């Protein structure tokens, strides 16, 4: 009985450790995020992909300069960026380009005048 209990516990732990990987993403979606898209929209180009599963290895299907293409994914910290209700009157100034540019738990978020490092929104 004791061996069966241990085997059952081991099986539950193995399955449970896979649940976040299965339920946290859509089918075919790869880990990581898309890099910031600052490219100007100069011409209409057809999308090279529709979803991550169409991209090789560690690349993700992301918007870049007005169309979707396979690009290297970037690491994303937990939490979401707070909403910024302000309007910017000065030129855009980016203080970061990806979450890994920010210290600790801070995220690289869009603000009224560009991107900067901010604490994730609560709730």
Swiss-Prot record:
Molecular-function GO term, any one: serine-type endopeptidase inhibitor activity
GO terms for biological process, alphabetical: antibacterial humoral response; innate immune response
Gene3D superfamilies: Elafin-like
Any Pfam family: WAP
Keyword annotations of the record: Disulfide bond, Protease inhibitor, Repeat, Secreted, Serine protease inhibitor, Signal
Cysteine disulfide links: 34-62, 41-66, 49-61, 55-70, 81-109, 88-113, 96-108, 102-117
Secretion signal, residue range per the UniProt entry: 1-24
Protein name: WAP four-disulfide core domain protein 5
Job description of the protein: Putative acid-stable proteinase inhibitor.
Gene this protein is translated from: WFDC5
Transmembrane segments: none
UniProt keyword Signal present: yes
Keyword set includes Cell membrane: no
InterPro entries recorded: Elafin-like_sf, WAP_dom, WAP_four-disulfide_core
Domain spans labelled WAP: 27-73, 74-121
Gene Ontology cellular component annotations, sorted alphabetically: extracellular space
Compartments where found: Secreted
Domain of life: Eukaryota
Main subcellular location of this protein, as a coarse class: secreted
